[in-house]
Amino acid sequence: MRDRPYTLLSCSVSIDGYIAGVASRLLLSNDADFDRVDAVRASCDAILIGATTVRTDNPRLLVRSDARREERAARGLPESPMKVTVTRRAELDARADFFRVGDAEKLVYCASPWVAAARDRLGPVATVVDAGDNVEMRTLTTDLAARGVDRLMVEGGGTVHTQFLTEDIVDELQLTVAPIFIGDSEAPRFVRDGTFPWNPARRAELVEVQKLGDVVLLRYALSSRFQEAERGDGC
């Protein structure tokens, strides 16, 4: 068994690198890309988002296609993947769609000082896991692997993207670029400041460019595990 899941980071951005507006959500994808993302979700064992994304976007994180849900059920899997979120201070509402909608298992990784509060608030709707004082993503993914997660999809937001990428635990990046500009430095970006492994001396490998209506999918291999997965050698 691998010490962490094969990890795929998926994000939609504006041309100038933002993932949302300041005051409201923006539609950065189209129907073709939504369907592509749905297929990727259906192929994964778990989907991870940060607590801020749970609060601001209130996502359900479900597989939408009836056919894909049926195919998962036929394989003995839940209709949608496990939902995972990360929080430092347990500031989550148990009534959020993340917890309320769907039958998939829900995990909340929480910083040690706030675990008791998280279990009081979220215990009826999720499993709260003590993630240590610093909530490092490598430790989190090791725990997910021990729980049987072989393929993990990370869907935001910027802080979570930054943590996964700077810790060098992303195997594949799927970046959809929408034909709009945000033009506001206060808006959330794809990543925050950090020391990233990919630089002029270590360039990410672009493996696919796909036009999907008016958006473009850029697919990058960020580790050797990408080639292994593509060959079907396992994740």
Protein language model features and the residues they cover:
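Enzymes that bind and transform nitrogen-containing heteroaromatic metabolites
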Residues: M1-C235
